[in-house]
Amino acid sequence: MRTYFYRVIFISCLLLVSVFSLEGQENRIAIDSISIQQDSNKVEILGSDRLTLLKVDDTTSIQILAGRVRLRQGKALFNCDSCVLNNSENIFEAWRNVQIKDGDSIQVNARHLLYKIDKKIAYLDGGVTLSDRKAILSTPSLEYNLNTDIGIYTNGGKVVNKKTTLTSKEGYYYASLKEIYFKNDVKLNDPGYKITTDSLLYNTATQTNRFIAKTTIIDSSGRRIETKDGYYKGGKAEFNQRPTIIDGSTTITGDRIAFDDSTGTSQAIGNVVVVDTAQGTTLVTGQLFRQDNEERMLATGKPLLIFKQEKDSLYLTADTIFTAIQPNAVEKDTSLLKNTTRISVSKKDSTLRYVEAFHHVKIFSDSLQAVCDSLYYSDKDSIFRLFRDPVLWSKENQITGDTIWLYTKNKKSDRLTVFENSMIISQVDTGIYNQVGSIRMEGRFTDGNLDSLRAFGNAETIYFLQDEDSTYTGINESKSDLIDIYFSIQALERIVLRGAVSGTVWPIQQKNPAEMKLPLFKWNDLRRPKSRLDLLQ
């Protein structure tokens, strides 16, 4: 077909030469309704400087137009420098300054056009641009269907929309929807973010990006997002199919993640996993709310926080877990429980975090377990503060009090302080318990294992005496200013009473061991998490 048209062009050029040779003749021709078809697909010649009619054979005649050519087909207008219309082939071809105006908003420009009149399909090449008043598409060649308002390029293309530039090897432009489907080596550059993917849907009117393939997004802050499905628009986004967000040392993965940069908030839903490599923690939860600019996170839906250690990781669960950057100032607040703290608003240390856990708090590690109603932990002092009916277990030993502070060092238990109504109970046999109670207790750990404990203030004990054969010989029921308790492999080994001591050593036959209980005795074994699985029940 192209060979045929080049022959026609050659003939037409000869004819044009004869036209140009006529001096003093008015060349501009105003033509209102000359057409090469008589149906709804007819092409009307609106104007041209020169028009030549040429009959090639009995079945073929062509019209050659040159100079300011204007054509119309339906709502589409065509402009060019020269054009050849072929009524038998139902096509026309145009050269130089080619322009198609499709309705009020679409304009296509190129150096060359081959147009199938009956199918309303335009094949353009040579510096092709398509504009919809919102964005400009540039490509070496373009197929544009005026019936469907769909443009297709397969030799690479670029779209510029304000400050956003998109490139791909293939593209499909849907004019009525103002959407472009970019395919194969898609790249988006914007001052606020960059996108790399294999497939992308982009709306030129709303500047919305829709992801339908594996996609990587890197924003101006360095935050990296990996997703397979979702959308991104003006700082608002929603991602599906387990996207991942990497923000500094924090990696967040969930079934669905949404964020709004204007408010600095994000939300992750469904099997959420948050890994903080700087802090050595992993958070697993059903739902996560995050204040990104403040690095605050609120986890609900059976959250599990893991403090990773080389040998003995610590697992923490609660109804709700909150974590944030640690403020510098910590001051007393007497309106709260004794020994609790209030965090003042001040300049923050971006390397330290704190954790708050609320309701049904459980802790599990191989060396110790604990439960309480609420908990506070800070990287600043590495102390776990357990509030409201706390219980801590270390092997056979149960420790209770109004408040318990567990000090850690190098991610291992180091010290222990129990405030008010302190008590330690060690089960030595069925229904037989060694017990020490006091106002306050302080303990020490060696290599993460409970080594010793000192009881202060109104200290009292019930201790079962055994001979070398482990036969029970008596019961020591005493009071003292101080009581020191020593452990061997975390089992209670001996008790030493210091200061003023009063009490009685009862022969084992005179007392019922099951009745030997201190006033605050309560065995909480049913509350104790026995494994990591117990934390999730």
Annotate each language-model stretch with its function.
Residues 24-537:
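N-terminal amphipathic/hydrophobic interface segments
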Residues 1-28:
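Bacterial Sec-dependent N-terminal signal peptides
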